[in-house]
Amino acid sequence: MKNEITLQTRREFLRRTVLTSALSWTVPTFLANTFSALQAEAMDRATQITTGKDSTILVVLQMAGGNDGINTVIPHGSDYYYKARPRIGIKADQVLKINDQVGLNPGLKSFKELYDQGNLAIVQGVGYPNPNRSHFRSTEIWQTASDSEAFEKYGWIGRYFDNACSGCDPTVGVNIGRQMPQAFAAKVPKGVSVDNPQNYRFINSENGQEGQMMEQSFRELNEQDNSGGSISAINGPSQLQNQRKGSVMDFLERTALDAQVSSDEIRAISARVESKATYPGSQLGNSLKLVAKLIGGGLPTRIFYVSQGGYDTHTNQVGTHQRLLADLGDSVKAFTDDLKAQGNMQRVLLMTFSEFGRRVSDNANAGTDHGAAAPMFVVGPRVKAGLLGQYPSLAPADLFQGDIKYTVDFRSVYASVLESWLHTRSEPILGRRFQPLPIV
């Protein structure tokens, strides 16, 4: 009787989880009834993914807050730049010059080194039509690859998973952070979120604390019952297949087991693999260090997602911005050094983005306000290094409401990465054709 009550309690928990979920789930057939069977299957999938022809890895790095692209890739050859920014303009003799017109912020010494090595492409003037200056909405546009007037339920990475990753390992996408980005939202949820190897979270959770509780609950649900059998074995295999095949219970049980396997694997890899480079002690440095460990440990992930905050520089920008960019450059350089020492550098491409740039003119508080277009950085030994696209004009007559006009649609960058790096068609993911750029 006690066992029946326990089972009923467990079933009720799972039903409530389904009813309160905000996601639409497509329920697959239950394929594994025990932890060991799933683990073997996961290892088989991992081998197929990591040894296949599409074993490239993408790392998406969000520069959250709205990076000032004009003080990142600096048009030091433009008089308009210095006239518009009397308080925060970077002196020409401090700029890390790429040519006689543009150069990098002095905080980006590591990026200049990557550029000189042929491992950095700079896509200039990236944005989209009818730009939105809201942090929330513009981030949503970038993460869902939508038009500024349209609202998409699923993220561009999630749509990639839906279109190209049927049957993939649960760790096909890994976010390093406390909350899953909307970019991962998918019809069939895939991917995991972790802010450190001991603090694993489900992609389905709205917040980190709930995610930890869900993991603990799922672990308890899949422990041995007092009767000596696991939940999936209580009714016997044939009865389970006949009565529960394709049910929501099946999917949740599979989700729990998948999560248990992947979380244990992430923890094990993190403990086993040693870093081969010295990283900054920042949040970004630690995030990229973990990503490098997971790559070195053979986790079958196609897309990693990391974030660096602090770019909403409305006041006293110069020092803060330079420190952020130094952290960015040094963290990414350490990451590339680590991957090179592992022998994995050829497999990895890193791409940065920020939800918008900043206004051309500085403000009275020695900062900048929300703007529009900004550059993107693409890092890796297989990039076509150099400057891509056209730097937007800073001439007052060429501005739109005080902002530079975009010259490259960000979805063209996504299309380039999807087609040339992840080897999949971009139209089903982006909704229509965007002309790829010669990035890789």
Residue ranges and their predicted role:
Residues K2-Q342, S361, P375-V440:
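Feature for exported/extracytoplasmic and membrane-associated proteins, marking the mature portion
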Residues A364-A366, G371:
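Histidine/acidic-residue-rich catalytic or RNA/ligand-binding cores of hydrolases
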Residues M345:
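Conserved H-loop
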Residues V348-F356:
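Acidic/histidine-rich, metal-coordinating catalytic segments
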